Regions:
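Short, surface-exposed secondary-structure edge patches
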Residues: 107-112, 195, 279-282
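Exported/periplasmic cell-wall-interacting domains
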Residues: 18-59, 213-294
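SH3/SH3-like beta-barrel superfamily modules
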Residues: 19-70, 111-146
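Sec-dependent signal peptide recognition
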Residues: 1-7
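Non-catalytic extracellular/periplasmic "stalk"
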Residues: 74-156
């Protein structure tokens, strides 16, 4: 078990690992605890972050082969309904999901897995693999076409997105020390169907990067409304990106005073554009973890 205490507000000392602040991006940096509005405060949830890092260390030691499940835009096939329903008992929707089967029943999926989720690969068979999800209980059988193996089981880049406090942390693991690289405000996805949804909780792999991610006008299948710069995708259509630019404007926008306030995005995580560029340049596809927490 990794334990820590705050030392002079500068570093977190651990008995098995260490978290230290050594920023590589230092614009719009937030304090460990900071004022929000007139009467409330927000914070970086270091205890919760430490718990996840502790769990990750155990996960990596327990399972030699890691990977992630993927079905962006249903590229690997839309999964079957669960008892006629398009959402599972945990609230995970069918769209762009991965079918999770009980090992003793491969006829109908029992749950849906979220695109990009971190998993351990326990056993491989001709058509299915037995996996253990990092973010949910149980072992599951998954059709092999939805599963991607990762070459290493020792992650050294992590991003924590906090929906409750509307902030983000980026971290590098150097030897046994996790270095905090940035601490910044964001806005996450809001619950406003049918076009907006909360950024889903879970642990994901960075899967894709786009210098400019084009987005459509709500309700349209072909009208481009604008673009989001330095977009890094981690699950379904959820990206970390800079401030959106609505056409006819084309030049990038650096900052919005709405960052760090309330959820406002469709599902994405909106950053200052220079911070989005930092994440875009710093992160590694299939090698960077994204933890979405509350």
């Amino acid at each position: 078990m990794i334990k820590f205490f705050l030392l002079l507000g500068l570093s977190l000392i651990l008995n098995a690992a260490q978290i230290e602040k050594e920023l590589l991006y230092n614009k719009y940096t937030l304090k460990d605890q900071y004022s929000y509005g007139k009467k409330s405060t927000r914070q970086f949830q270091w205890e919760k972050i430490n718990t996840y890092l502790d769990k990750l260390e155990d996960f990596e030691k327990t399972y030699p082969t890691l990977g992630f499940v993927a079905n962006y835009k249903n590229i690997n096939g839309s999964p079957a309904l669960i008892n006629g329903e398009t959402i599972d008992s945990d609230g995970v929707p069918r769209n762009q999901a991965i079918p999770l089967y009980n090992p003793n029943n491969l006829s109908t999926p029992a749950k849906y897995g979220r695109d990009g989720s971190l998993v351990a690969i326990i056993s491989r068979y001709e058509q299915f693999s037995l996996i253990k999800s990092f973010s949910r209980d149980g072992e599951w059988m998954v059709p092999n076409r939805y599963l991607d193996e990762i070459s290493s089981n020792d992650f050294n880049k992590a991003i924590f997105i906090d929906r409750k406090n509307q902030n983000i942390v980026t971290m590098d693991k150097i030897n046994e020390t996790w270095k905090v690289r940035s601490m910044n405000p964001v806005t996450t996805g809001r619950n406003h169907p049918p076009f907006s949804a909360p950024t889903p909780l879970g642990t994901y792999i960075v899967q894709e990067k786009k210098y400019k991610m084009l987005y459509l006008k709500d309700g349209s299948s072909d009208i481009i409304e604008g673009y989001s710069p330095y977009a890094v995708r981690f699950t379904r259509g959820a990206y970390m990106h800079g401030i959106p630019v609505n056409l006819p404007r084309t030049e990038m926008i650096e900052y919005s005073p709405l960052l760090g306030t309330e959820p406002r995005s469709h599902m994405c995580v909106r950053n200052a554009t220079s911070h989005a560029k930092f994440i875009y340049d710093w992160s590694r596809i299939n090698q960077t973890l994204v933890f979405v927490i509350d």
